[in-house]
UniProtKB/Swiss-Prot annotation:
Naturally occurring in which organism (per UniProt): Vesicomyosocius okutanii subsp. Calyptogena okutanii (strain HA)
Gene of this entry: folE2
Any GO BP: tetrahydrofolate biosynthetic process
PANTHER family: GTP CYCLOHYDROLASE MPTA
Disulfide bonds: none
Hydrolase recorded as keyword: yes
Family as reported in the entry's similarity comment: Belongs to the GTP cyclohydrolase IV family.
EC primary class: hydrolase
The protein's name in its UniProt record: GTP cyclohydrolase FolE2
Function according to Swiss-Prot or TrEMBL: Converts GTP to 7,8-dihydroneopterin triphosphate.
Family matches, as InterPro entries: GTP_cyclohydrolase_FolE2, GTP_cyclohydrolase_FolE2/MptA
E.C. number: 3.5.4.16
Catalytic activity: GTP + H2O = 7,8-dihydroneopterin 3'-triphosphate + formate + H(+)
Keywords from the UniProt entry: Hydrolase
Pathway where this protein functions: Cofactor biosynthesis; 7,8-dihydroneopterin triphosphate biosynthesis; 7,8-dihydroneopterin triphosphate from GTP: step 1/1
Length: 264
């Protein structure tokens, strides 16, 4: 029997009359190319979750069409063009709502502060795209690892201060008609930290980053407040959720702070 004569069970009627808010595929891994703010193309691996709503009278969605969308397209993404794949899901799945999440490692080449030796630094990035009532919204989340050094420890200790790796997480909704780059959020987080991280450091670099952190102590509260000042002033961002988790080197727990702001 040819495919054209096989029954299409998904399109059959459903008598329970219950709308499904989200149905689709979750955590499918697919190669992608990310285009950075300078137009450079970076091959990486993305994990997608793609869903649509399902009317009460339809039995099932067409799961294979989500995969077809990934296979038919070049899978070249940037924060600026992410809304295009949402439109493709809407058209191919014939739905009024669509939700897409793309999670991937993003790499930047960084120079060590003294020796200038270059290495690749990785950041975990998530793009969120939502279509609802004809409006497309895009959000960017980036996790930026940094160094934080305790101001209290510095003030009371003769020989140094405890410091640790911290994760600053910024989730930002892009204002309508504006472009927000991943690099903008990474630069902001690293600029406000006690010191940024590098994959490769020589001895003179290690001396420099250690002293830089000592000269720029910051509580977890300082980190989120300093970053929030800049996020509040950035009209490319209409909403943000900002977190910092410090993996305390002298405790078996983390210090944590969060600021959330719906700007408009």
């Amino acid at each position: 029997m040819s495919a054209t004569h096989l029954p299409d069970t998904q399109n059959s009627a459903d008598t329970r009359h219950i709308i499904i808010d989200k149905v689709g595929i979750k955590d499918i891994i697919h190669p992608i190319t990310y285009i950075d703010c300078d137009g450079n193309k970076m091959p990486t691996i993305g994990m997608f979750t793609m869903t649509v709503s399902l009317p009460e009278h339809v039995k099932g969605t067409h799961m294979s069409r989500f995969i077809e969308i990934l296979n038919e397209n070049s899978c070249e993404f940037s924060a600026h063009n992410f809304d295009q794949i949402i439109d493709k899901v809407k058209e191919k799945l014939e739905s009024d709502t669509a939700h897409i999440t793309l999670n991937f490692p993003f790499f930047r080449k960084k120079e060590a502060p003294s020796s200038g030796v270059k290495s690749m630094m990785d950041y975990q990035v998530t793009l969120y795209g939502t279509l609802n009532k004809g409006e497309v919204q895009v959000m960017i989340k980036v996790v930026v690892p940094v160094t934080s050094l305790c101001p209290c420890s510095k003030s009371i200790s003769k020989y140094g201060a405890h410091n640790q790796r911290s994760h600053i997480t910024i989730k930002a909704k892009v204002s309508k008609g504006r472009t927000l780059h991943i690099e903008d959020l990474i630069d902001l987080a690293e600029r406000k930290a006690s010191c940024e991280l590098y994959a490769l450091l020589k001895r003179d670099d290690e001396k420099m980053v250690t002293e830089r952190a000592y000269d720029n102590p910051a509580f977890v509260e300082d980190l989120v407040r300093d970053i929030a000042v800049d996020l509040n002033a950035d009209d490319k961002i209409s909403y943000y959720c900002l977190e910092s988790e410090n993996f305390e080197s002298i405790h078996n727990h983390s210090a944590y702070a969060l600021i959330e702001n719906l700007k408009c």
